């Protein structure tokens, strides 16, 4: 007698197809159906600024794909060879095998130059996207609880992206990349006591040595991308776990999200946007030349490229070095270089200031609540002013890093530009903060007037007694909600200095500092009180003009 057989039934009653059987097999071992059921209808809000994070993700994936292709042909070797290849102007020139293989990729490997340029453009877009994405998160307060850890992940990705870019464009060993390595070596040598030892350890001897490229290669293609890939995965997991932030609007609060489901709407849009990003980068790689290494020639320690500039995201670090006075201190037979070491130390500190801000603000406010509704930047003028001040400092230092380019193109004195940048480093961020804060307060006043008096229609009406007035149109409920939904919590205060028994209670110095910062950041001078319901009803009832 034949044994009974169990047949998998498909969704339409017939025998399951191969794809469905494979899915059933995977579900029996991984529980995919339960995972999909829990997340496929997860709602994601729809706003153009949320695409900034997706640009970063897609650029990172494109970097991995193009990087794998380039790795197949690049040889990270400092061994010197005589070039005999397709680029005739360099035939017979002594160069490293790394530079020779880069030339081979550019001229002999099918599609090699296109992939090289896509890779470089994707790196620039990746870092640019991360910075712009973090600024969106910063200005809207999306870093608040429970997303502080995700902010740290994002900041770490930005820092590692900058370091990965530095190691990447140092690999070809052309004159421009070698100049960048020399710049880094000078910064390392400026470290007191251990600088020389670190330089010898990194380069395997005196600069330039033969070990730096073989050592940078695994860091660039394995270590840093592996760490970044793990951080990207963790970042996305936390986005799913915490649910996405959303801009204020009707029906949106800290408990509900208004938007489109993950499947199929969001995934369809995400897939299309990935290919759109890839297409744009492919066009940039095919039409816009970047880093023509053959034009620079091989690196030689006694040569330097006129107008040598790093990628934009490292320009501010060079600006720090260029505008710093060339101080030198001789102490007990040792030479200290504060003119290099101080700006070299400020490089990570400027980035660190951005990374620690969420924790500083949380300590000042003492706010322990979860926040899923984004702030409008105008409603938090001090935070917005600080962000603009940080960006203005970045731009000023970027100009300082290109002072020679500015001088030659605009026919200006390089010394005048250097002194302008030195003064601007201290003046411009302060002015940017003040102007931004005043603009935010002005926008708050305009919002208050719009809520109480409505929108200007441009229609002028003459009253019976001869007075001319402009007709205002009441705002829609959606607009009223957007303009008035924000909370205006009182700032942290120390409270009474004596208790009910008249005994002076101890107050720590940190509490005084916290209270002072709270007044400066969230006190009455930093906001325009939004209209109350009573004021709105009184104005709209017609009792007042």
What are the language-model segments listed below?
Residues 2-323, 341-545:
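Membrane-embedded alpha-helical bundles that constitute the cytochrome b-like, heme-associated redox core
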Residues 323-339:
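Membrane-interface amphipathic/re-entrant loop segments adjacent to transmembrane helices
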């Amino acid at each position: 007698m034949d044994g009974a057989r169990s047949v998998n039934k498909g969704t339409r009653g017939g025998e399951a197809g191969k794809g469905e059987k494979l899915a059933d097999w995977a579900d029996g071992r991984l529980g995919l159906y339960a995972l999909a059921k829990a997340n496929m209808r997860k709602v994601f809000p729809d706003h153009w600024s949320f695409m900034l994070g997706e640009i970063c993700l897609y650029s990172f994936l494109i970097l991995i794909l193009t990087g794998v292709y380039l790795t197949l042909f690049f040889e990270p070797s400092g061994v010197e060879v005589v070039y005999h290849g397709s680029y005739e102007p360099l035939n017979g020139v002594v160069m490293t095998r790394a530079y020779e293989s880069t030339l081979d990729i550019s001229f002999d490997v099918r599609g090699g130059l296109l992939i090289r340029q896509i890779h470089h453009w994707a790196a620039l877009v990746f870092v640019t996207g991360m910075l712009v994405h973090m600024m969106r998160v910063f200005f809207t307060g999306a870093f608040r609880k429970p997303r502080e850890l995700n902010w740290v992940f994002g900041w770490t990705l930005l820092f590692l992206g900058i370091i990965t870019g530095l190691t990447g464009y140092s690999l070809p060993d052309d004159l421009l990349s070698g100049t960048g390595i020399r710049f880094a070596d000078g910064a390392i040598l400026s470290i007191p006591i251990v600088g020389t030892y670190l330089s010898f350890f990194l380069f395997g001897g005196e600069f330039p040595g033969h070990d730096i490229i073989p050592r940078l290669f695994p860091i660039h293609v394995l270590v840093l991308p592996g760490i970044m890939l793990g951080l990207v995965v963790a970042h996305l997991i936390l986005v799913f776990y915490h649910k996405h932030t959303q801009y204020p609007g009707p029906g949106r609060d800290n408990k509900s999200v208004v938007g489109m489901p993950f499947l199929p709407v969001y995934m369809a849009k995400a897939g299309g946007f990935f290919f759109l990003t890839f297409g744009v980068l492919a066009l940039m790689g095919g039409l816009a030349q970047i880093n023509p290494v053959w034009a620079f020639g091989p690196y030689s320690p006694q040569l330097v490229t006129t107008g040598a500039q790093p990628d934009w995201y490292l320009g501010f670090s060079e600006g720090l070095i260029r505008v710093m006075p060339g101080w030198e201190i001789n102490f007990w037979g040792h030479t200290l270089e504060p003119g290099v070491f101080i700006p070299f130390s400020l490089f990570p500190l400027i980035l660190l200031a951005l990374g620690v801000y969420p924790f500083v603000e949380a300590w000042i406010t003492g706010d322990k609540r979860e926040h899923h509704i984004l702030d409008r930047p105008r409603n938090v003028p001090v935070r917005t002013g600080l962000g603009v001040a940080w960006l203005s400092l970045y731009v000023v230092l970027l100009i300082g890093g290109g002072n020679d380019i500015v001088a030659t193109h605009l026919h200006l004195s390089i010394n005048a530009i250097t002194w302008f940048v030195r003064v601007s480093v201290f003046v411009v961020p302060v002015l940017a903060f003040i102007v931004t804060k005043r603009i935010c307060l002005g926008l708050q006043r305009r919002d208050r007037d719009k809520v109480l008096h409505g929108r200007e229609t441009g229609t002028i009406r003459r009253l019976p007694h001869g007075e001319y007035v402009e007709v205002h149109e009441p705002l829609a409920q959606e607009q009223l909600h957007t303009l008035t939904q924000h909370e205006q919590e009182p700032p942290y205060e120390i409270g009474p200095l004596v208790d009910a028994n008249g005994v002076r209670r101890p107050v720590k110095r940190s509490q005084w500092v916290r209270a002072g910062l709270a007044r400066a950041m969230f006190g009455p001078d930093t906001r325009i009180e939004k209209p109350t319901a009573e004021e709105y009803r009184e104005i709209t009832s017609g009792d007042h003009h």
